[in-house]
Amino acid sequence: MKLQTIIDQLGLKVLTDSIDFSNLEPSSGYVSDLLSCVMAGAKKDGIWVTLQSHDNIVAVAALLDVTAVIITEDAQPDPATIARANSRNVILLSTPQSSFTVVGQIWGLGLRSE
């Protein structure tokens, strides 16, 4: 499944610089707000769903090379976090929906964890 499909179907807002998502295809998903759990459980090329919006999410996402981070519940990263994400090629997306709802929608679209 293409990342652009997920963005369109869930009505996600792209927070970082727009890039061509046409070749990005997440292979799995992971949901957690505890960074140590994310580092242990999230997979390369996956989607990470969290309500965290602080600068450390960029470091973790870059370390794991996730496809994108979906920030839920209208949590908004500050401009410095977005700038850091841009410089590290980390895609940040946002939604007013809860993490539970987002994960259910992604599951409904057919994306599964490995």
What are these regions (language model features)?
Residues M1-I19:
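N-terminal, charge-rich interaction modules
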Residues F21-L24, D33-I47, L51-E114:
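Feature captures the catalytic cores and cofactor-binding loops of soluble hydro-lyases/lyases
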Residues S27-G29:
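Structured beta-strand/loop patches that form or line metal/cofactor-binding pockets in enzymes
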